[in-house]
């Protein structure tokens, strides 16, 4: 038995969906523990490309129980749309469970999110406009609507009548927007409640029962470490905790049940939205990475900013999450490059800095210190074993492992399931994989 957390080691969009999908074959339970429809993950199965925002990647395996945990915020309309899409494709959602204590994104959350971002002007933070921040704000202010509240018609009417009256004042006085009709919202969300009811459970109890039966549990994070509310590039962050520690709170489990943390990172770096990005590339190479990597957001369709691999934020992610091993994705995107640069440290006002600075202002002033390594100038998308990789590609992976000081367990070379090198099974294998320490580049 192994209970594993999968987290993003960069700014999100690292390819966690594919990695979670691969690992779900060995998992009995998959738990999404934070975030909402602001995060999207893409899974390619044969000729089908599935884009999901709330439903865990494990939904494709009928024997894998999929849980949307209490740390998430749920837009019922989007969730039910995903359920319908999957069922139209012949994929059952009978094994989907929803935490009764997860909070619900309401229409006023979306309106306030979009209006607030627009008011920021040049100081915008890059929100998706899906209402995530305001939903988490209401959760913190103890005025939010939870899934279990949807299941109580009389209580829901009472709550929403009061809440919408308050929100209408904000919409009118602060943003100049027309009021919401409380009766229409109550009717709409009461309808959602009946459709969701068969899936609603006490998720913490369900997870505990699985753990006591020694089931394999996979905890799936959304976004990435550098978007974490407490540990990311604040204020250009999300409103929840994507880091590994967030799995315990968002799923309702104790830290002692976590056996392993897998960090997912691209072979380069991307970021969507606003905020500092030291290794960002603006020329031809940045455009090549964007086009070859299809770097457009699953949720918003926004173009992702692209840059070289940043080992400083990588080491920070290892430290914050206690990462045991890495999954490196999109190695094939680098196939055509003559040489590749890796940021090994920063220069801040003439001083070398090997660690991630907490201040956004300091981070914005960081100049990357690069080490240049040779490219391999040949396709890697067909490789299925380490021995199949060009020597320069293998050397690149070794270099990343040395810089991050953790082993590499998985290498992804394309969107399809089979375009993957499994160096070591992160769930059932020992904690070794590709490990390089003290400058030793031999596999252990």
Swiss-Prot record:
Pathway in which the depicted protein is active: Purine metabolism; AMP biosynthesis via de novo pathway; AMP from IMP: step 1/2
GO biological process, one term: IMP metabolic process
Positions bound to IMP: 13-16, 38-41, 128, 142, 223, 238, 302
Presence of the UniProt keyword Transcription regulation in the record: no
Physiological role: Plays an important role in the de novo pathway of purine nucleotide biosynthesis. Catalyzes the first committed step in the biosynthesis of AMP from IMP.
Gene3D superfamilies: Adenylosuccinate Synthetase, subunit A, domain 1 (3.40.440.10), Adenylosuccinate Synthetase, subunit A, domain 2 (1.10.300.10), Adenylosuccinate Synthetase, subunit A, domain 3 (3.90.170.10)
Family in the record: Belongs to the adenylosuccinate synthetase family.
Gene name linked to the record: purA
Any one GO MF annotation of this record: adenylosuccinate synthase activity
Pfam families: Adenylsucc_synt (PF00709)
Source species: Synechococcus elongatus (strain ATCC 33912 / PCC 7942 / FACHB-805)
Enzyme Commission designation: 6.3.4.4
Cofactor needs: Mg(2+)
Keyword Magnesium (UniProt): yes
Matches recorded under SMART domains: Adenylsucc_synt
Active-site feature positions: 13 (proton acceptor), 41 (proton donor)
PROSITE patterns membership: ADENYLOSUCCIN_SYN_1, ADENYLOSUCCIN_SYN_2
Record's protein name: Adenylosuccinate synthetase
